[in-house]
């Protein structure tokens, strides 16, 4: 039975074949989000931010509902990659636009349901991927007035209130691709 660490390279291989993957695109393992309260098992940053939650045979789906809600606040696409033992419950518990992949004990992987674009992203949570200097750069680029003494959460709120999600998303993608290159 494969554990999440063994599933991750199989998943990366599948993603590289099934999705556009250019030289400048990156895979990010264990990316923290929602104020470091959550962690995505794998994120693919290409023209969008795609997150994957891995549930191995040894895991349960007991935390998936809360995890799914958090993923929806931050990522363009969300996928659940689960062991075949979890498939029925996964299909019942996943929102209709969450993609579902199944992995077996022999390193096989199959797409059960394709992910659809997520329309529930939250601008404030999206800014949580950015470091302070990246937040300041985004503010300067768009003329959003901030002060160096402002708390990071205050700057994030100002940017969320002032900018469209497309501008925030583009900056987050560029920063993450640069940071994890």
Identify the residue ranges that each predicted region occupies.
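Surface-exposed, flexible loop/turn segments at secondary-structure boundaries
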Residues: 50, 86, 106-108
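Non-catalytic C-terminal interaction segments of nucleic acid-processing enzymes
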Residues: 16, 99-181
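Interdomain/boundary linker segments immediately adjacent to catalytic/signaling cores
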Residues: 1-2, 181
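Active-site metal-binding core of divalent-cation-utilizing nuclease and nuclease-like domains
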Residues: 2-50
């Amino acid at each position: 039975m494969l554990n999440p660490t063994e599933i991750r390279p199989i998943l990366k291989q599948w993603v590289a074949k099934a999705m556009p993957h250019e030289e400048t695109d990156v895979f990010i393992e264990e990316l923290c989000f929602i104020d470091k309260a959550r962690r995505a098992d794998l994120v693919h940053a290409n023209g969008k931010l795609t997150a994957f939650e891995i549930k191995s045979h040894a895991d349960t789906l007991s935390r998936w509902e809360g995890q799914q809600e958090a993923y929806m606040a931050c990522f363009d696409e969300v996928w659940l990659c689960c062991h075949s033992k979890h498939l029925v419950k996964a299909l019942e518990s996943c929102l209709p636009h969450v993609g579902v992949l199944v992995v077996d004990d022999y390193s096989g992987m199959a797409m059960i349901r394709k992910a659809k674009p997520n329309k529930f992203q939250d601008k404030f949570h999206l800014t949580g991927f950015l470091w302070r200097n990246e937040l300041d750069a985004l503010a300067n680029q768009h003329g959003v007035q901030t002060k160096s003494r402002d708390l990071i959460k205050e700057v994030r709120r100002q940017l969320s209130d002032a900018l469209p999600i497309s501008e925030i998303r583009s900056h987050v993608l560029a920063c993450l691709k640069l940071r994890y290159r």
